[in-house]
Swiss-Prot record:
Keyword vocabulary terms for this entry: Early protein, Host-virus interaction, Secreted, Signal, Viral immunoevasion
UniProt subcellular location: Secreted
Name assigned to this protein: Interleukin-18-binding protein
Superkingdom field: Viruses
Function: Soluble IL18-binding protein that may modulate the host antiviral response.
A GO CC annotation given for this chain: extracellular space
Record family assignment: Belongs to the orthopoxvirus OPG022 family.
Taxonomic placement: Viruses, Varidnaviria, Bamfordvirae, Nucleocytoviricota, Pokkesviricetes
Signal peptide feature range: 1-20
Pfam families: Pox_vIL-18BP
């Protein structure tokens, strides 16, 4: 009896995602304005298991990319904002660069991790 319950439960959890109509989600998009980068991406399935964040890589050094919170003054990222439109959840995260001289040789990468995989998009100040 427990096995039947488990099978029925798993079918109920997975069936809506397997048999759902294909929903189109655009790739990551970055919009720039004075001193900020706005990264937007959408999630088709299980948005609670998705995460959006920014990385920064100093192109003059051999160091790996770093999370924004490890870079100190002159840069910060807002909390991720999510909006729901039907069955699509759109995530958005804004990166604020106030010290453009300090970060003029950096590459910034917006990363969206979902159950479908990882999407990345790069942008530079100059």
């Amino acid at each position: 009896m427990r096995i039947l319950f488990l099978i029925a439960f798993m079918y109920g959890c997975v069936h809506p995602y397997v048999n759902a109509d294909e929903i189109k989600c655009p790739n990551l998009n970055i919009v720039t304005s004075s001193g900020e980068f706005r990264c937007t991406g959408c999630v088709k399935f299980m948005p609670n298991f998705s995460y959006m964040y920014w990385l920064a890589k100093d192109m003059r050094s051999d160091e790996d990319a770093k999370f924004i919170e490890h870079l100190g003054e002159g840069i910060k990222e807002d909390e991720t904002v999510s909006t729901i439109d039907g069955r699509i959840v759109t995530l958005q995260k804004v990166l604020h660069v106030t010290d453009t001289n300090k970060f003029d040789n950096y590459r910034f990468t917006c990363v969206l991790t979902t159950i479908d995989g990882v999407s990345k998009k790069n942008i530079w100040l100059k």
